[in-house]
């Protein structure tokens, strides 16, 4: 929910201000354009990101969020910000259901922190869920398995092996998608030096065990209602094969640390204590078992007596209370002691001692979440992790027994510990210490923490860090051995250093040779401390960015791949929501009506689907580009496409910047920031050549629409729209994998340049996802060169798709209505909605050049502004058209820009409906086939490359586009012209 109490109402209940004191570093206020209904639906993260953007150097006016805003990478999607062209920055942060084809032997991590070989998943007796990364929420999650399939390997098909810097290895088919900081990239397209996102936890192998832990006979002495409650939740009988065993072991471990089982008002209850976030995670586990629990937060006085003195004060106490007597009794049967634990003898339950290793892992992870210390570092070295428990003096022996039981469990994971007593005036206190880097690494990689978010994220980050440190030390040790061998053979320090120069410096080699070797290898001086590593590499939820150190194609030594279908996938705005993708939308009008098209609508969709290549690098190729031709696309965009016969010269007058960013930047005198053809790596060229002229998947689409309602008849007529029922065509796609690759090649440069920005402007960037470069620097110019080259690719892509769509209409309706010209198929407008552009705007009464970032936002210029920037005026006497796609089941809009938008939002408005539900959530909730059937019932036909994509784009997954448009209209930053409704949808 939004922090509504912080928002200041400006006007019309659709314009709101986020004050500068929301975050101390804000240089300007935030400005939110949304109805109260839309405000209520915005994640708090949107407002935090608005505030973070307001902290960037050189920002003017406001950090803006439009009504379709939702949480993004760095900037909110639906965000706008303008920066001084001399004293500001450019930031890439401003501008899904996957089937994975994996090699046998691949380890798949489950919800319980254990792994299963992919080929063994169908054989498992349990229905454990798999662990996934919910990108929307920045946290791990779990998902049910939809299916596990196997397929034979095709003749001459190769596999790809990818190795990261910490040693993580994955092998799969070339089209297996891998998550990178910029989104999903196919395994076959990853290169050495690329970055990928990993989950740094090894876990232990899943092991099945037969038999029963508890059954009805264990509850013969209790009220039958207790047994009924447990049976209704499938908690009795409790068998080893039930995945709930892992959850119960976790809960029991935490309860033995921070839980209390006792009577309250004569009723047995179970309570847990701790940090609110920790208890909310625990509450999720309880609810997954069907057990209700309530959080209670209160202030309380405390008194603590330690060896060093007595302390008292006030603290906030948080309790998670389970009212169910039945569940409390179940926990008691599982070994939870009744009464004050400090005064009650207990031990590690026998069933835990007898359990498979993965169950023991969950018990320990819950226990250490409660009573274990968080991992800490002294620069490069981890400090001991301690488990602390106390008893009254009479129970010292019982305490030692319990701690020794825990030590024995840890030893089964290869983790050695030390037990020692801590001085205490009141009770006997013992600490079980995990000491030594190897032991700590094993604990973090195999056991770790559950529930406590801080401990868990720190633990995951620490494990990744220690694995990286281990690999670096190993490389340096091998370099020392190699250097010594080369020196012995050649007698040359120079040759010895040349042999290992990519790993160590010359001084290291000299020490190896002259000092008789190196007794113990340490990390180099420039190796990051743990704190710096976290800052640079760790994402929300403990996921970590790692560099790929090896990629190789291999001949499979097996005869089949395995495919996993899950009901959860990562939200793809990490890829699509950044500048580099330059997504955009185009609308064309026709002189046909719905009555003309409806009888042959299905045939039309089939024809478009056949003529317009879809998907990820569709095999159906209409164009085969040479490298030189692709370089021409990078420089000239849609103009290149028209010269090659894809469309007409008149089309260019209805495209933002005539579809040619070279011309646009030459016109305004900033040609050094325009596109260049030398910014593309070999890999970008390889990706771009086959994908030009393809629609793409995800939220990319081609729709056949009809005019549903006309609001401004004069403006509509100037656009060629005369009546309701008239057919239009909307194309939504972008720069495909080429844009991703070109700009991701430059992203690491931007990340490095951020330190220069902080030094230059004396600021601290509040979010590392706001990587940026100071305008005027080579890094900023190169980024613009790359981004504008990708923009040209996108303009050319939409131009080619439009041409083939015209041909499809002629193929289906030509005999009856003539050629494309006879049918009046003309471009109304084509505009990008993920771009940063250099534009001139008034600031404090003075015209200034600004860098305007529009992420998931659309330019909405007045006619005067178009002329000032040398932009084509598509319709004389009208502001620039604005195209707002909705969802498949409702509609889209054509708006026009306003003077109010020029004054307040740098000539910007919303770009679409905006999501309310992640793709993962949509696929959990909807079946693509059901969505398609329901749309057909409404008169909307869908032709898609896959049904999961249809599920992702289900209408309920989006905000109400009518509400979004109402917000910008009432705010005065756009005026509605027509509403369009879909009748046919083509998706890649």
From Swiss-Prot:
Cell inner membrane found in the keyword field: no
Gene3D superfamilies listed in its UniProt record: Homing endonucleases, tRNA-splicing ligase RtcB
SMART domains named in the record: HintC (SM00305), HintN (SM00306)
Record bears the keyword Acyltransferase: no
Superkingdom of origin: Archaea
A biological-process GO annotation: intein-mediated protein splicing
E.C. no: 6.5.1.8, 3.1.-.-
Binding locations of Mn(2+) 1: 98, 583, 700
Enzymatic reactions: a 3'-end 3'-phospho-ribonucleotide-RNA + a 5'-end dephospho-ribonucleoside-RNA + GTP = a ribonucleotidyl-ribonucleotide-RNA + GMP + diphosphate; a 3'-end 2',3'-cyclophospho-ribonucleotide-RNA + a 5'-end dephospho-ribonucleoside-RNA + GTP + H2O = a ribonucleotidyl-ribonucleotide-RNA + GMP + diphosphate + H(+)
Note describing how the cofactor binds: Binds 2 manganese ions per subunit.
PTM comment: This protein undergoes a protein self splicing that involves a post-translational excision of the intervening region (intein) followed by peptide ligation.
Ligand binding (GMP): 699-703, 833-834, 885-888, 892, 911-914, 987
Cofactor(s) listed in the protein's UniProt record: Mn(2+)
UniProt: Mn(2+) 2 binding residues: 583, 732, 833
InterPro entries: Hint_dom_C, Hint_dom_N, Hint_dom_sf, Homing_endonucl, INTEIN, Intein_C, Intein_endonuc_central, Intein_N
Single GO MF descriptor: DNA binding
Domain DOD-type homing endonuclease span(s) in chain numbering: 251-415
Record keywords: Autocatalytic cleavage, DNA-binding, Endonuclease, GTP-binding, Hydrolase, Intron homing, Ligase, Manganese, Metal-binding, Nuclease, Nucleotide-binding, Protein splicing, tRNA processing
Signal sequence residues: none
Family: Belongs to the RtcB family.
Assembly description: Monomer.
Biological function: Essential for tRNA splicing and maturation. Acts by directly joining spliced tRNA halves to mature-sized tRNAs. Joins RNA with 2',3'-cyclic-phosphate or 3'-phosphate ends to RNA with 5'-hydroxy ends.
Entry protein name: tRNA-splicing ligase RtcB
Natural source organism: Methanopyrus kandleri (strain AV19 / DSM 6324 / JCM 9639 / NBRC 100938)
Gene name as annotated: rtcB
């Amino acid at each position: 929910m939004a922090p509504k109490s912080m928002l200041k109402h400006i006007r019309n209940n659709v314009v709101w201000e986020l004050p500068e004191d929301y975050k101390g570093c804000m240089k300007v206020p935030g400005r939110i354009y949304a109805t109260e209904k839309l405000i209520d639906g915005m994640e708090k993260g949107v407002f935090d990101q608005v505030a973070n953007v307001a902290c960037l150097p050189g920002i003017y006016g406001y950090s803006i969020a439009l009504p379709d805003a939702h949480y993004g990478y760095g900037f909110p999607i639906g965000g706008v910000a303008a920066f001084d062209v001399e004293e500001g920055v450019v930031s890439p942060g401003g501008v899904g259901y996957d089937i994975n084809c994996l090699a046998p032997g691949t380890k798949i991590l489950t919800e319980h922190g254990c792994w299963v070989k992919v080929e063994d998943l169908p054989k498992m007796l349990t229905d454990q869920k798999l662990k996934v990364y919910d990108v929307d929420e920045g946290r791990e999650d779990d998902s049910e398995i939809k299916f596990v399939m196997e397929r034979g390997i095709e003749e001459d098909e190769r596999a790809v092996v990818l190795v990261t810097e910490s040693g993580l290895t994955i092998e799969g088919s070339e089209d297996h998608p891998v998550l990178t900081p910029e989104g999903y990239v196919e395994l076959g397209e990853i290169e050495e030096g690329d970055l990928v996102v990993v989950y740094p936890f090894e876990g232990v192998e899943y092991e099945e065990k037969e038999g029963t832990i508890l059954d009805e006979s264990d509850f013969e002495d209790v009220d039958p209602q207790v047994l009924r409650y447990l049976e209704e939740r499938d908690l009795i009988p409790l068998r080893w094969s039930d995945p709930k065993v892992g959850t119960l072991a976790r809960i029991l471990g935490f309860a033995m640390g921070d839980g209390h089982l006792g009577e309250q008002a004569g009723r047995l209850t179970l309570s847990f204590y701790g940090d609110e976030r920790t208890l909310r995670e625990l509450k999720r586990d309880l609810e997954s078992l069907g057990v209700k629990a309530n959080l209670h937060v209160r202030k309380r006085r405390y008194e603590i007596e330690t060896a060093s003195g007595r302390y008292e004060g006030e603290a906030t106490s948080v309790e998670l209370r389970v009212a169910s007597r039945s569940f409390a009794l179940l926990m008691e049967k599982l070994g939870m002691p009744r009464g004050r634990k400090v005064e009650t003898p207990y031990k590690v339950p026998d069933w835990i001692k007898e359990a498979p290793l993965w169950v023991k892992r969950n018990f320990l992870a819950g226990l250490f979440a409660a009573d274990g210390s968080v991992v800490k570092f002294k620069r490069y070295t981890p400090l001991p992790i301690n488990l602390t428990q106390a008893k009254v003096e009479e129970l010292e022996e019982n305490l030692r027994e319990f701690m020794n039981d825990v030590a024995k469990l840890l030893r089964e994971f290869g983790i050695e510990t030390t037990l020692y007593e801590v001085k205490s005036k009141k009770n006997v206190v013992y600490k079980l210490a995990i000491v030594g880097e190897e032991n700590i690494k094993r604990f973090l990689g195999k056991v770790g923490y559950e529930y406590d978010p801080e401990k868990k994220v720190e633990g995951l980050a620490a494990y990744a860090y220690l694995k990286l440190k281990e690999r670096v030390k190993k490389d340096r040790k091998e370099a020392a051995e190699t250097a010594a061998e080369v020196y012995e053979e050649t007698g040359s320090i120079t040759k010895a250093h040349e042999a290992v120069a990519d790993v160590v410096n010359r001084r290291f080699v000299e020490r190896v040779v002259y000092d008789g070797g190196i007794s113990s290898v340490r990390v180099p001086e420039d190796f990051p401390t743990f704190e710096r590593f976290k800052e640079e590499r760790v994402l929300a939820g403990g996921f970590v960015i790692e560099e790929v150190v090896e990629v190789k194609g291999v001949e499979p030594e097996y005869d089949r791949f395995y495919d996993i279908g899950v009901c959860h996938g990562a939200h793809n705005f990490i890829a699509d929501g950044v500048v580099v993708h330059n997504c955009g939308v185009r609308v064309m009008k026709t002189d046909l009506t719905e009555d003309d098209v409806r009888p042959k609508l299905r045939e039309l969709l089939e024809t478009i689907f056949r003529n317009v290549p879809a998907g990820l690098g569709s095999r159906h190729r209409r164009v085969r580009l040479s490298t030189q031709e692709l370089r021409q696309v990078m420089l000239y965009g849609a103009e290149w496409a028209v010269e090659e016969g894809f469309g007409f010269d008149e089309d260019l007058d209805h495209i933002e910047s005539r579809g040619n960013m070279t011309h646009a930047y030459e016109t305004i005198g900033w040609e050094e920031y325009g596109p260049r053809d030398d910014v593309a790596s070999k890999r970008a060229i390889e990706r771009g050549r086959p994908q030009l002229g393809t629609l793409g998947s995800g939220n990319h689409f081609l729709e056949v629409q009809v005019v549903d309602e006309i609001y401004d008849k004069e403006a509509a007529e100037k656009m060629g729209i005369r009546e309701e029922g008239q057919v239009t065509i909307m194309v939504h796609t972008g720069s495909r994998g080429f844009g991703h690759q070109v700009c991701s090649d430059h992203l690491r440069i931007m990340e490095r340049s951020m330190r220069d920005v902080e030094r230059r402007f004396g600021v601290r960037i509040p979010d590392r996802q706001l990587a940026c470069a100071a305008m005027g620097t080579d890094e900023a110019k190169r980024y613009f060169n790359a981004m504008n080259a990708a923009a040209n690719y996108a303009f050319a892509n939409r131009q080619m798709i439009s041409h083939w769509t015209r041909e499809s209409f002629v193929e289906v309706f030509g005999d009856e209505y003539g050629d494309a010209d006879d049918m009046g198929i003309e471009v109304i407008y084509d505009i990008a909605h993920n771009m940063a552009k250099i534009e001139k705007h008034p600031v404090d009464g003075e015209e200034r050049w600004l860098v305007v970032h529009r992420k998931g936002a659309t330019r909405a210029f007045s006619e005067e502004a178009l002329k000032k920037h040398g932009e084509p005026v598509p319709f004389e006497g009208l502001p620039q058209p604005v195209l707002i796609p909705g969802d498949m089941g409702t509609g889209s809009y054509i708006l026009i820009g306003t003077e109010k938008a020029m004054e307040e939002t740098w000539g910007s408005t919303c770009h679409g409906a905006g999501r309310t539900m992640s793709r993962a959530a949509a696929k959990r909730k909807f079946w693509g086939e059901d969505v398609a059937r329901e749309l057909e019932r409404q008169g909307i036909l869908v032709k898609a490359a896959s049904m999961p994509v249809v599920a992702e784009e289900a209408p309920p997954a989006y905000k109400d586009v009518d509400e979004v448009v109402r917000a910008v209209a009432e705010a005065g930053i756009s005026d509605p012209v027509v509403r369009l409704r879909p009748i046919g949808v083509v998706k890649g």
